[in-house]
């Protein structure tokens, strides 16, 4: 019934890794084709740390659906149920909720994403994730709740680590995604991802996920191969935000300009 694959769910079912590209700067949906060419599996469309509009997010999400890259959208903190429903109705296959501190926060996230009786999401007919097909309402609810409304909660503070087990126990939560930059900053060790305290925090989240059958994800460890390998092999992380479009442009621009600047003008023209 669902028109498009939830790559994260399918890969996770067989223990494989889902690689996401963050989009927070580029508004042209053609960025999705670049992501596909590079081998990404999913999109992390960022409405928290960007000025992307709801229309931008929908256009990029629908391009992702058509290209086989599962679109997830990070919404602004405490943006409200109405906004989340617009994002889902616009084509997102999952919502990423930042700054989840308690089990109550996690339950509210689930409540926002799922149709009754599992939540309070309002019904709408032609869903992009169902190919805009006219679909019986009970089928929309069943299919969307099962495979097209993933709930990703972000663990980004020390108090969230303390509540990781309770958060992971919430029915309907699919992924505990550690926001490494905010977490390390909140712990007073900003960017010190090698810290024993930071690693212990990640281990606590991994253990909670394993106990309750949830997926662990990581964001913010960009281009950190050593820690990414540790997280995938030792912590069983299966969802990785690999990089942001803005960082790729910045790094590529510096490399390109630096290569030209390094050319020595030591010969006079003939």
UniProtKB/Swiss-Prot annotation:
Subunit structure: Homohexamer; trimer of dimers.
UniProt keyword annotation of Secreted present: no
Function summary: 4-hydroxy-4-methyl-2-oxoglutarate aldolase; part of the gene cluster that mediates the biosynthesis of the tetramic acids Sch210971 and Sch210972, potential anti-HIV fungal natural product that contain a decalin core. The PKS module of tasS together with the enoylreductase tasC catalyze the formation of the polyketide unit which is then conjugated to 4-hydroxyl-4-methyl glutamate (HMG) by the condensation domain of the tasS NRPS module.
Name this protein carries in UniProt: 4-hydroxy-4-methyl-2-oxoglutarate aldolase tasA
EC number: 4.1.3.17
Annotated positions for site Increases basicity of active site His: 89
GO cellular component: cytoplasm
Catalytic function, reaction form: 4-hydroxy-4-methyl-2-oxoglutarate = 2 pyruvate
Active-site residues annotated for this sequence: 49
Family matches, as InterPro entries: Aldolase/citrate-lyase_domain, HpcH-HpaI_aldolase, Pyrv/PenolPyrv_kinase-like_dom, Pyrv_kinase-like_dom_sf
GO molecular function, one term: metal ion binding
Pathway: Secondary metabolite biosynthesis
Obligatory cofactor(s): Co(2+); Mn(2+); Zn(2+); Fe(2+)
Binding site for substrate: 182
Binding-site residues, a divalent metal cation: 156, 182
Domain of life: Eukaryota
Organism: Hapsidospora irregularis
